[in-house]
A protein has these predicted regions:
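Conserved, charged catalytic cores of large soluble enzymes
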Residues: 22, 26-45
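C-terminal non-catalytic regions of proteins with extracellular/luminal or membrane-system context
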Residues: 1-14, 26, 48, 56-440
């Protein structure tokens, strides 16, 4: 309805609508949806549903997506032989809802973080559990007093050698139902703070004085600045919504069966006060491309249990024609003791950009498997489109001039360098020719 009106008013050209429809129909044709015979996707045999291969793939996705945000003095991985009692505390510790988010199917089995830790440790380690608080209400029981589960959480914390806090959100707090004011009913959350009494619970448990690993189960960014700065929180791992058996992956990550290697696909801000209103379509402060502010965790950031070294970053030449592709080379080496899946990132910035143009933008990424001590050369080719900027008229233009290309395991910002202790390599190349329009 609105698109039809926009077309009538000359706000959208009919050819633009046609191009969008053609793309949509192209995908449907390639999926076999327009054929006379039934699509193979409509006749998947039931015996492949939740088959061992799919379960293994789901578990691998859980492992690959986890992002290690903090790991003071290499506190993780935990050494089970040194732990007699572990306390698992928090509203998401034994929550199935926190595993799957929304748009999920029904699994034949769910493994929560609590269950994953219990299964991994077996009888060798005593596992204590306390819910601590409701996900967002002041009490767990309907007729309970406020903070009705705090005491049991503190008792468990006092008796533990290590505490695993499981906090965050679930689809009941963040979702796609209704408008931004529909928090707690599957709408958009109103802020970045941990909801309900979760922050207060975290601070109360930290006051006990035992080392804490904070695992966050959520589908979006949260303000974890207190946990990042507090010395008692030794490690923070963002597990997102890890899937039906996600608790198994969380336990294996905590105890070092593999190293978390994920990188953040979003920016974690410390607050929303400086962000523009939702109806303000200027890009100032929106995403890593348009902000120069200090952020909590930058886009592209993530730690591992290993150590990765980048060296010999270069391009074959430094001068390129306006529509010439640019191939970037870099050597990546795993100098640590854990195999990793490193995400090599390439960012591009036009040195002569206008104030409203974006800064560094991720234009190339390559996932590289590295065994301990292994070294690989990685080549990433950037197309002319990767150097283009969008004009105020909506045209996709490549400009002649100087470009900066940053290569490494993170974005080229001061905060990432401070968090990881590493820097990226910056190359300078020149595009020669005239301003040229390219396809989106």
């Amino acid at each position: 309805m609105y698109l039809s009106r926009a077309c009538e008013q000359g706000l959208v050209e009919e050819k633009t609508i046609t191009e969008a429809v053609e793309r949509l129909m192209d995908v449907r044709i390639r999926l076999g949806m327009m054929e006379d015979y039934p699509s193979p996707y409509a006749n998947i045999p039931y015996d492949v549903v939740e088959c061992p291969e799919h379960i293994a793939l789901s578990l691998e996705a859980s492992k690959r997506s986890m992002v290690l945000l903090k790991n003071d003095n290499h506190f993780l991985p935990l050494k089970q032989e040194q732990i007699h009692t572990i306390a698992v505390i928090g509203p998401n510790a034994n929550s199935r809802a926190a595993l799957v988010g929304n748009y999920e199917g029904t699994s034949s089995r769910y493994i929560t973080p609590l269950e994953g830790i219990q299964e991994y440790t077996g009888e060798k380690t005593r596992v204590l559990y306390a819910q601590g608080c409701h996900l967002y209400k002041d009490q767990v029981e309907f007729l309970g007093e406020p903070k009705d589960r705090f005491k049991e959480a503190l008792i468990a914390a006092e008796r533990a050698d290590v505490i695993v806090m499981c906090l965050g959100l679930d689809a009941g707090i963040e979702g796609e139902e209704g408008d931004a004011g529909n928090e707690y009913a599957s709408g958009d959350k109103l802020g970045l703070k941990l909801p309900g009494l979760q922050q207060e619970l975290l601070e109360a448990v930290a006051a006990v004085g035992k080392p804490i690993v904070l695992t966050v189960l959520a589908g979006s960014a949260l303000d974890l600045s207190w946990a990042q700065e507090h010395a008692q929180i030794r490690a923070i791992m963002d597990c997102w919504y890890p899937g039906a058996r996600g608790g198994k992956a969380i336990a294996e990550a905590l105890f070092g069966e593999f190293s978390p290697c994920g990188k953040l696909p979003v920016t974690f801000y410390e607050g929303t006060e400086f962000l523009p209103d939702f109806t303000d379509y200027s890009m100032a402060e929106r995403t890593y491309r348009y902000t120069d502010r200090h952020v909590l965790y930058p886009f592209g950031y993530g730690l591992t249990y290993s150590q990765i070294r980048y060296s010999d970053a270069h391009a074959d030449v430094t001068d390129f024609g306006i529509l010439e592709p640019v191939t970037v080379h870099v050597t990546v080496e795993n100098t640590g003791t854990y195999p990793v899946q490193e995400a090599v990132q390439v960012y591009v910035r036009f040195s002569e950009r206008e104030a409203y143009d974006p800064g560094y933008q991720l234009k190339g990424i390559r996932s590289v498997a590295l065994e301990c001590g292994e070294k690989k050369e990685v080549c990433i080719t950037l197309s002319p489109r990767d150097f283009a900027l969008i004009s105020e008229e909506g045209k996709c233009l490549v400009h002649p001039g100087s470009y900066e290309i940053a290569v490494g395991g993170q974005q080229p910002d001061e905060r990432s360098s401070r968090l990881t202790g590493q820097t990226v390599s910056t190359l300078f190349i020149c595009k020669t020719g005239n301003v040229t329009e390219v396809e989106y």
